[in-house]
Structures are given as C-alpha cells and as structure tokens.
C-alpha cells in the first residue's frame, strides 16, 4: 500500500527512487505508474526520479507468464513505516536493507524484516487469532457431525484457514 509504505509520497509529494530490481541488463520497453488497493484515489505514484529531472512514468519491462516482477522503493526508512502505521489494515510490508560495495558493485543483505501476517494484523485490532482458530475449528467439527462436510473437507478447510491466518497480508503467488 502506498499509504502504508510511502506515506510522504502522497502526503507531501516526496519523490522516492523506485526501479525494477531484476532484469537489470534488459532495457525496459514499457512505461507505467504505480497504483495500489486503497479506499480512495490517492494510492498512486505518478512522479519518479530520473537521472536529471522528474518523470511522470516509470520505465518497466514486459511481464512474462509465471515470472515474478519486483520493484524496489529506496531511501525509505523507519519514519515512513511509523507514519504509515496500519492504514487500510494491510500491515507492514517485507523490508530489506542492503549495502552496495562501491568498488565492485556487489550488494549484501544487511537486515531482512518479514512483514505482518493476517494473524498479526487481527491481533493489532484486538482479535485473538487463537480464539478465532478455535471457534472456526468448532464450527467445522459441527459441520462434520451434521454431515454438511466430510472429515477430509474439514481437514482441507482447516489447512486453508491456517494458511490464511499465518500468511502475508499482501497478495502472494
């Protein structure tokens, strides 16, 4: 979420360096803006740092089927995360800090922080994931007793529930 991770981009029109972080040896062939899932129309970034000025689009590559495409937003720190807090209840994103060796250009992951799970965000707003899990399990067991679902379906449903509540709040493949 732009609101969550880059609040100054919409609040004071701060421009952060943003670029693809792979396929760096390929020339981008597309132009685009960034837009996210928000409750209003401000969740977009339409200004990007260029070598000499500001661009209104971001150079991007064609997407390939079944291939992830990642962008990095740089010079984002704890201040942005603190301001973003829990807007839209999407939680914190995964964050990585890197250093780049100025001599050979190689990079090193200095610190990796995993973003919030659905259970984390639910607990922030006073819902107990364990109580939700127990309640859901009781309902699934009752559905088996009442012959609404089979024991195998109950197991699949509970596995999906666990995967969901322990999963990341943002879309994952």
Segments (PLM) and residue ranges:
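Charged (often Lys/Glu-rich) extended helix/loop segments that serve as interaction or gating elements
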Residues: 1-173
């Amino acid at each position: 979420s732009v609101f969550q991770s880059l609040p100054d981009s919409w609040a004071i029109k701060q421009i952060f360096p943003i670029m693809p972080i792979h396929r760096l040896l390929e020339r981008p062939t597309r132009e685009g803006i960034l837009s996210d899932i928000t409750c209003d129309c401000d969740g977009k970034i339409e200004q990007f740092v260029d070598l000499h000025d500001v661009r209104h689009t971001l150079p991007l590559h064609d997407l390939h089927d079944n291939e992830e495409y990642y962008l990095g937003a740089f010079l984002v720190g704890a201040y942005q995360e603190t301001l973003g807090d829990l807007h839209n209840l999407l939680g914190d994103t995964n964050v990585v800090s890197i250093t780049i060796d100025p001599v050979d250009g190689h990079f090193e992951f200095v610190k990796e922080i995993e973003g919030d799970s659905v259970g984390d965000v639910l607990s922030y707003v006073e819902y107990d994931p364990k109580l939700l899990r127990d309640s859901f399990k009781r309902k699934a067991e009752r559905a088996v007793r009442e012959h609404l679902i089979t024991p195998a379906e109950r197991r699949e449903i509970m596995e999906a529930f666990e995967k969901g509540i322990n999963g990341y709040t943002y879309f994952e493949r």
